[in-house]
């Protein structure tokens, strides 16, 4: 299956997990999804009081320079591990 199809399928699989992944795992999923979909982070870093938005933005910027294909493949691999762990 081509990478784009694997990436789309992984997005559907992660929605069906029986338990929610940890916050760290969710941030990793988010950052890989954004990097795979859009490339390097864009826009301004959220303000100090937007803890959730800031954490998400920082996770995404941590992937700066990673190719979209590498991010998509890493996302697919992570979802596969999470499905094995959380069902």
Task: Tell me the role of every PLM-derived stretch.
Residues 1-87:
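A charge-rich, low-complexity, intrinsically flexible signal that marks solvent-exposed coils, linkers
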């Amino acid at each position: 299956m081509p990478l784009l199809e694997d990436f789309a399928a992984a997005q559907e699989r992660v929605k069906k997990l029986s338990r929610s992944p940890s916050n760290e795992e969710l941030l990793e999923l988010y950052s890989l999804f954004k990097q795979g979909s859009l490339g390097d982070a864009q826009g301004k870093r959220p303000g100090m009081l937007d803890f959730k938005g800031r954490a998400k933005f920082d996770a995404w910027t941590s992937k700066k320079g990673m190719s979209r294909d590498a991010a998509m493949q890493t996302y697919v691999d992570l979802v596969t591990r999470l499905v094995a762990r959380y069902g």
